[in-house]
């Protein structure tokens, strides 16, 4: 493959495993750039260099995908902490940082894919669906920003409800980008 050429997610999967580093929230907290509580990824605005360094650490550890750290960076979490006006700048900053790192791989290494990210909403309620249309709008706006900033794929992660994961997947599929969903079971075995 010519240097600098980037294969799609499907092309990579057809050749073998694809690694996507996870654990941003806890690692950023461990490094002192986030305190427990609402776990909103303000690091992309307040300490962008720390986020870039973490992406590079994951990249050097073998991650094939640089995932934008927008986990919990949705309208509801921003409303709760009184910073809803920073929602779009936070998301776009995280996406730009991820894109920068994805395009700047070490010499001889295939460029990483950059993933836009959405997560559970904390307000989805399978028994009272009145808030679910708000969640769908939150997913759509985050997907839109990821597309605008040049994401190669989308990842929806840590959904507790299958219905919410399906709503996320529906919004993600409208982008035309390859999409991956992860679901966290609340049933303890």
Residue ranges and their predicted role:
Residues 1-48:
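N-terminal basic, low-complexity leaders that serve as flexible interaction/assembly modules and, when applicable
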Residues 19-21, 66-68, 114-116, 154-156, ...:
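Hydrophobic faces of well-ordered beta-strands that scaffold small-molecule active sites
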Residues 22, 58, 98, 154:
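Conserved, mostly hydrophobic/aromatic
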Residues 38-46, 59-61, 65-90, 151-166:
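Glycine-rich, proline-tolerant flexible connector loops at the mouths of alpha/beta enzymes
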Residues 51-54, 87-101, 135-149:
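An active-site-proximal structural segment forming one wall of the substrate-binding cleft
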Residues 60-61, 105, 109, 125-184:
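Alpha/beta enzyme core
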Residues 67-77, 115-126:
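Substrate-binding cleft and catalytic face of glycoside hydrolase catalytic domains
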């Amino acid at each position: 493959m010519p240097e600098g050429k980037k294969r799609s997610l499907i092309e990579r999967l057809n050749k073998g495993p694809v690694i996507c580093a996870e654990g941003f929230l806890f690692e950023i907290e461990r490094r002192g750039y986030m305190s427990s509580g609402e776990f909103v990824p303000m690091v992309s605005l307040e300490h962008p260099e720390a986020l870039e360094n973490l992406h590079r650490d994951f990249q050097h550890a073998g991650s094939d995908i640089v995932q934008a750290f927008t986990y919990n960076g949705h309208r509801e979490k921003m409303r709760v902490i009184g910073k809803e006006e920073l929602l779009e700048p936070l998301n776009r900053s995280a996406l730009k940082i991820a894109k920068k790192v994805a395009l700047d791989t070490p010499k001889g290494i295939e460029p990483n894919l950059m993933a836009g990210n959405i997560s559970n909403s904390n307000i989805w309620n399978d028994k009272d669906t009145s808030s679910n249309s708000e969640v769908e709008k939150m997913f759509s706006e985050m997907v839109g920003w990821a597309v605008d900033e040049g994401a190669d794929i989308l990842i929806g992660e840590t959904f507790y409800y299958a219905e919410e994961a399906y709503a996320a997947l529906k919004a993600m599929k409208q982008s035309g980008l390859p999409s991956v969903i992860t679901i966290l079971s609340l049933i303890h075995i």
